[in-house]
Every structure is written in C-alpha cells, then in structure tokens.
C-alpha cells in the first residue's frame, strides 16, 4: 500500500466528526430528558431515555473506533476541527450519561424518603 492509500482524507475524518456530533447530540438530549423524567418521578421513562442515550452514544463510539482502528493500522490522520468537536461532544456526553444514571438513583431515593413521611 502506498502512502496515499494509508491516509484517511479530511473529508472522511470530518464525516466521522459529524457523525460523532449527531449521535452524541442525540444521546445528550435523551439524557437531559431522562433527568427531567426522573425529577418528575417518572422513573420508567427516565430509565428508557437513559438507555436510548446509551444506544446513541454506542453508535458514536463505534464511529470513533473505526477511525482509531484505521490509525492504529497505519493510516495517517489529519485532525479537523469538526473531529475535535465530535470527540469533545462524545466524551462530555459519556460523562453526562454516567451522571444521569447516578442522578436517577438519587431522585428515586429522594422520592422514597418523601413517601415515608
């Protein structure tokens, strides 16, 4: 394989970046709605939404993994701003999903304590 064949184009990298932003953005929206549902006491809906967020973030992660695999295989990568934005969105949304799961449990515990009174 020549050097050109071992190089992902800027367009390919940007397309992955756009996919990361799209999937992670959908995941972020679902996670925020899950928090809203938990705060309202609708824990079934909250859990459903956090699982949707997880599915969306898994799709984003799959996109990222494909690009990482190419780079690990020797392909050269030019970093694009949209890819940096995509990575940032992916990582912050992964953290948000983890925190959302924790907050759902907190809201549930608060509701249980309120019901004891």
Where do the language-model regions lie?
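Terminal alpha-helical segments
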Residues: 2-117
